[in-house]
Each structure stands twice: as C-alpha cells, then as structure tokens.
Amino acid sequence: MKKLLVKNIGLLATPEGKSAHRGEEQGKIKFLKDAWVLIEDGIIASVGTGAVPAVEGAEVVDAEGHLVTPGLVDAHTHLIFGGWRQNELGLKLHGASYLDIQNAGGGIQSTTNATRQASEQELAAKASKALDEMMGFGTTTVEAKSGYGLATEHELKALEVIKDLNDHHRMDLVATFMGAHLVPAEYKSNREEYVRLVCEEMMPKVKEQGIAKFCDVFCEADTFTVEESRQVLEAGLKYGLRPKIHADEIEAIGGSQLAGEIGAISAEHLIVCPPEGIASMAKGGVIACLLPATSFNLGAVFAPARDMVKAGVPVAMATDFNPGSCPCLNMQFVINLGCLKYKLEVLTAVTLNGAAAIDLADKVGSVEEGKLGDLVIWDAPDLDYICYRVGSNLAKTVIKRGEIV
C-alpha cells in the first residue's frame, strides 16, 4: 500500500459533501488549523488536527504551515483542437464582435478546419502540454469537450484523444460530446440535415464508442435555436448522455429556460441570463457553470452569479479554455476574477460544485475521507491571499491521487 502523509498544514480549507452546494451553503467552508491528511493508495484515508500520526512506510510531505485546499476542478474546457486564433485579437481590438468573426469564416469554423487536418497524435500532444500547464496551476480534474470536428469521424477522433489522455496523463478527464457546437460550412444551406446528422448518425456511434458522458449544445443566435438544442439534448438522453448547454452567452434566446425544462446537469456561460432563466434553472436543479475569464477576454459583463446564489442555483466556475474566446487554462485566474464578485463561494465553485457539474462530487472536490487524494499546497497563508495576488502562480505543490506532480 502506497501512503502519503501531508503534515504541518497551517490552514486546511475545504467544502464538504458529495453534492453541489447552493444558497448560503455555498459559502460554508470548513477550516482546520494545524492539520494533516493521510492518503493511502490514492484515496484520502483520514484527516485530522494536532498530533501527527506515526504512519509506517509513508512518504511525508511538509506543508510548512501553508494553506491546503482540494485540487481544482475545471468543469468546462474545449481542450481538443488544432491551431490557434491569435490573429482574431486584432479584429476584436478594432471592434469586431464574436459573431462578426464567426460569420466571416473565423471563430469555430476556423478551428474546425485545423482540427480536421490534425492527426490524433498531434491533437493529443498539444492537449497533453495544456494539461501539464493546467496541473501546474493546481487543476487536478478536467472536463473536455469535442466540438471542433463537426463531422462524425472527427468528433469520434476528438473523443478518442480524450480517452487516450485520461488513460496516460496524470490528470483525470471527463468527456463531453459537442457535435452541436456550430453548423459547419458545408451544411450552412441545410442546417436541418446537420441536426439530423448529429442526432441520428453521430449519437449512436458516440454511444457505441462509450467515451462521452455528457452531450452539450451551443444554444445561441446564429448557432442553434432553442428547438434545435432541445432536439439535440433529447437525442443525447436517448443515448445515455446527460445534457449540458451553452446558454445566454451573447443573447438570451431561451437556453437557460431550456436547461431547467430538460433537467440539464449544468448550463454554461450565462453572461446575459435573465431572471426567468435563473428561476427555471433553480426549479430544474441545474448547476450554473460560469466562465469569468471568457467575460474578461470578450470585454463582456460578468454573469449574474449573486442573483443565482440568492435563487438557490449552485454556481461552479471554470476556464472555458479554447483557442478563440478564452485561451486561458489557469484556474487561479478564474479564482481571481471570481473573488472580485463572489467572495468565499468561489472556493466551492472551483472545487465541489465544479465536480458536481461533471457528476464527480462523490469522488473529488473536497478533502474528505474516501475521496481521491487530490490536494494543492499553496504558497499562501489563507484564501484571501490567493485572491489578493492576481497574476501569480501560487500552487507550491500539487498532489494527484496521492502522488506529487
């Protein structure tokens, strides 16, 4: 049995439980001073304070009085893609909107072209490098979407890359099928046929492949309508894929309401989510997965998280790592942005609620007996210091499944 004992923890900060926290509960963090954590065979065996137990054969890590939290959970990324889109930055600076760039042949379609041309090996090498960087910032679990293939063989290729990474990289990954990310150029004049392709050709093969756990759709002006999104998500349910939805990022066309109606596990973005959308999500038990780094990168407003918390909607936060609207893979930056608005709830948002948004709250997201031994030792005395030191990487030591990264 492999054992790791983390001792001399100045402050251990963690949410508790195996499900998403909402309302006032989201701000309730357990703090333990002078703490220690014992991990056996990758699983947290015990957590305590005061006298450190003598554990025969254990590797001992001295936290040196620093802060320890759960490993961060990035519950929304577009990890698998070819190319980059730095050329679009100049267009944005000259006033082009996200939809302007997309409608001019840039945006998602540009990345689709590059992704189709890339081999599985090339995509895996690029994504593996990104995962290394993510882990260096304290992320230990990642959701990864397909969605830049937009053709059956290329969507399946992306999901195979995610499986390969999960099998061979230290990071734990959860796969989401997102064939309905955009209507590709070859179907622009026949979007109904593309929706049919996603639902009737891609979905059965995704189920047969057995990698994806969720189905996502981009419900937005100039992408997929509410009814098309409903069609895609209902087809996903038929094939055992739990629904997620990109909603209310640019225009509020009804995506957040649909999330509540269909019982999505999460709705993503929600920058312009209206009150009726918040009410629908609260009623449907939907987790709001907010992406503040995207708002920052787009120069957009931030999602109304406080209204969501007050309404009883659980809030998670993630990077939205992608080559266009948010080439950010640093969850610490997400924390920095979140702390400007959301105070203590941000730790729950980037750990336990993020885990719940990908159906892993029983395994990760808190420092508790029986969960995976995923920890971050921070070069910080407390949570306030992480929020305060904008732009610095304060992850001193990252521990994944009881092993030092």
Roles of regions detected by a PLM:
Residues 63-126:
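Metal-associated gating/positioning segment near the N- to mid-region
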Residues 20-28, 350-352, 356, 372-405:
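C-terminal cap of metal-dependent C-N hydrolases
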Residues 238-243, 260-262, 299-381:
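His/Asp/Glu-enriched, well-ordered alpha-helical/loop segment
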Residues 111-126, 132, 140-253:
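Metal-coordinating catalytic core of metallo-dependent amide/deamination hydrolases
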Residues 5, 58-62, 398:
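Conserved beta-strand scaffold positions in the cores of enzyme catalytic domains, especially
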Residues 9, 37, 42, 65, ...:
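Divalent metal-coordination and catalytic microenvironments
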Residues 194-201, 205-210, 224-310, 328:
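Catalytic core of soluble alpha/beta enzymes
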Residues 1-54, 383:
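N-terminal metal-binding scaffold of metallo-dependent hydrolase/deaminase domains
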